From Swiss-Prot:
Region forming the signal peptide: 1-26
Cellular compartments per GO CC: peptidoglycan-based cell wall; plasma membrane
Induction field: Induced by albendazole and thiabendazole, which inhibit the GTPase activity of FtsZ and probably septum formation.
Coiled-coil parts of chain: 488-567
Name this protein carries in UniProt: UPF0603 protein Rv2345
Keyword Cell membrane: yes
Family membership: Belongs to the UPF0603 family.
Deletion consequences: Not essential for growth.
Main location group: membrane
Disulfide links within the chain: none
Protein's job: May play a role in septum formation.
Region spans: Disordered: 638-660
Keywords assigned: Cell membrane, Coiled coil, Membrane, Signal, Transmembrane, Transmembrane helix
Length: 660
């Protein structure tokens, strides 16, 4: 019986060995002793020779060792696992690649160390998928090994170089096109900016500050050239004008040209400073460019200020005959008015008191004298115009202008007599209304002075002077014999008083609006500060220092606003607005603190959250620090992720494996 049991145990062990043992031909990972190992017997003599030659050539060319091993199967392991274990067992390094092939199991693995120099992942995958695997699939075992060796021994292909060259060429073309487009856009942008800069007042420094720096530089260069050309032209024309009209008549033009030259010289000096080898900061360059433009603009305006007068002077000489004919016609027309105007003056003396006629009593006599003076100058001007002697044109100009002035005065004297009756009647009829208006103005002035807190300062002093002048004018107008003169004086003082009262009324309205704005600003600031203060007071247990700091500053600003309420309302409004802004910020910070605290206590789940937030219970609040007590600190995890840089599922190898 014992013998039977012993025999059964032996049979069981043998059966287990048959069932659990490796299949026939199985080859576990082992240490490789040769570059080409054919344990599956699939290589022919010529095939082994070809593989050996390819392996040797790879080592000779690139010092890379390729190990090739053929087995029937991988003893139940995956191809990658078997190959990796064989690599470790064989102590292969960074210059050792392995091609393992299971002929019966139709599996393979091609592993190349990722640290192997001169080999890319794409290159290895391309060799494995498109050269090794197809050869194995077709049963060409030696061809697969040769393909592996040649693939590792391959330098960058010509197609890759072509692709690289084409890519570089395309990039160069694109960059060139971009440069051309950008240059065109820059030129167009600079032209637009320069056109906009030309529309800016060149003497306005504030307006020039908004002009781009490049446009400012372009504008300065353009203006310097333009103004220099204008100065040169004006200098030449001035020399001819002095010869023609003399130095006295052309003195204003000479002064304008000299001023323009001085301003232009200053512009050139600054422009030289900009163009030297000493670099300037953008701010310094802007300041210098602005000085160039302003100086050039002043030079240009000096010339422009006299251009019109200079042209009129030349036109007067050129058109002297026609102009003298016109003056002669005016002389004749005014001379014919002397008799009728004298008759009209006599009639006025019978209608009005002599005192009312004082301002026009001698008008006819004076007009006759002016006409005689004009006649003499017209005759002298004709003689000079007929002679046309160079250098005597100044006398012609003086004679023409003297005649024009005399005729104008004679016309005004005669017109005054003709309109005297109408003017005197209008003055007499309008005097009561003007007097009433002045009396009303004086009354308003007295009321304003009574209400003013400081009657001897500011515009109130001007108002006192205007009121007193109006009162004196009223006193003189009472019983005046010359109503026209009285009316003229009263209208002037009335206009002055009304203008000053209107200005004071506008200033008072402005002050009233400012005070209303101040009251509104103070009300808003006080309301916000009070609301935030009450909010923090009822939730003091959860609000940190930031909100409290903003509130304290808001209170300080509000106090400053009250201090300046009377002396400087504008500053008081600014302080009140600042207090409102700070209070609003404090409210926002306080809300955030309360919400954070509520979330923390919600996570902890206590029943005293409201009391703690309100500062009634402070034990829990202080138990963990200012912020940590509201839930504690949450530590972060340490260590990298499973896919940290530098790690890979194949243990630092390129390539892979699979079935064929």
């Amino acid at each position: 019986m014992r013998l039977v049991r012993l025999l059964g145990m032996v049979l069981t062990i043998l059966a287990a060995g048959l069932l659990l043992g490796p299949p026939a031909g199985a080859q576990p990972p082992f240490r490789l002793s040769n570059y080409v190992t054919d344990n599956a017997g699939v290589l022919t003599s010529s095939g082994r020779t070809a593989v050996t030659a390819a392996v040797d050539r790879l080592y000779a060319d690139r010092r890379i060792r390729l190990w090739v091993v053929y087995v029937e199967n991988f003893s139940g392991q995956s191809a990658l696992n078997w190959a990796q274990r064989t690599t470790r067992t064989s102590e292969l390094g960074n210059y050792d690649a392995l091609l393992a092939v299971a002929t019966t199991g139709r599996e393979y693995a091609f592993l190349v160390p990722s640290a192997m120099p001169g080999v890319s992942e794409g290159q290895v995958d391309n060799v494995r998928r498109y050269q090794i695997e197809p050869a194995l699939h077709d049963g060409d075992y030696s061809g697969a090994a040769v393909a592996a060796a040649n693939g590792l021994n391959r330098s960058p292909s010509s197609s890759s170089r072509v692709v690289l060259l084409v890519t570089v060429g395309i990039i160069v073309i694109v960059v060139a096109v971009l440069l051309v487009v950008m240059r065109h856009r820059n030129r167009r942008r600079r032209a637009d900016e320069l056109a906009a800069a030309r529309r800016v007042d060149p003497t306005n420094v504030m307006a020039l500050a908004a002009v781009p720096l490049q446009a400012l530089d372009d504008l300065s260069r353009s203006m310097v050239v333009d103004v220099d050309n204008a100065v040169r032209t004006s200098t030449n024309e001035l020399a001819l004008a002095i010869e023609e009209f003399g130095e006295r008549r052309t003195a204003p033009f000479t002064q304008a040209v000299n001023n323009a030259k001085a301003a232009l010289s200053q512009a050139f000096t600054v422009r030289q400073q900009l163009d030297d080898n000493t670099p300037e900061t953008p701010a310094q360059r802007r300041e210098l460019l602005t000085r160039v433009i302003v100086s050039a603009a002043h030079a240009d305006r000096e010339l422009a200020s006299q251009t019109e007068a200079f042209e009129k002077l030349r036109d007067l000489v050129i058109n002297a005959p026609a102009r003298l004919d016109l003056l002669t016609q005016q002389y004749v027309e005014l001379t014919t008015r002397i008799g009728p105007t004298q008759q009209r003056l006599a009639e006025l003396h019978t209608e009005f008191d002599a005192a009312a006629m004082t301002s026009i009593a001698g008008n006819v006599t004076t007009a006759t004298e002016r006409l005689a003076f004009a006649d003499r100058n017209i005759s002298a001007a004709r003689d000079l115009a007929d002679q046309a002697v160079s250098g005597r044109q100044a006398g012609l100009v003086d004679a023409v202008r003297a005649a024009e002035s005399a005729l104008g005065q004679a016309r005004a004297l005669l017109d005054a007599v003709d309109s005297a009756a109408t003017d005197i009647r209008h003055a007499v009829a309008s005097l009561p209304a003007v007097v009433a208006d002045i009396q009303t103005g004086i009354k308003r002035a007295n009321q304003h002075l009574q209400q003013a807190q400081q009657p001897q300062t500011g515009r109130t002093g001007d108002l006192i002077a205007a009121r007193d002048a109006a009162a004196r004018a009223l006193d003189r107008a009472r019983g005046a014999a010359d109503p026209l003169t009285a009316f003229d004086q009263l209208t002037k003082v009335d206009a002055d008083l009304d203008r000053l009262l209107a200005t004071l009324a506008e200033e008072q309205a402005t002050a009233d609006r400012l005070n209303r704005s101040l009251e509104q600003a103070l009300f808003t600031a006080e309301s916000r500060v009070r609301a935030v203060s009450e909010y923090i007071d009822t939730r003091r247990g959860s609000i940190g220092p930031e909100a409290r700091t903003r509130l304290a500053e808001a209170k300080r600003q509000l106090e400053a606003a009250h201090d300046r309420k009377s002396s400087n309302p504008t500053e008081a409004i600014a302080y009140a607005n600042a207090a409102s802004t700070l209070a609003a910020h404090a409210q926002s910070l306080a809300n955030a603190d309360v919400q954070s605290a509520q979330r923390a206590y919600t996570r902890r789940g206590g029943n005293n959250a409201g009391a703690i937030l309100g500062g009634i219970i402070i034990g829990d609040l202080l138990s963990g620090g200012t912020r940590g007590g509201l839930g504690g600190w949450i530590p972060t995890s340490f260590g990298g992720s499973s896919n940290a840089p530098g790690s890979s599922p194949d243990g630092g190898f390129l390539g892979g494996g699979g079935r064929f």
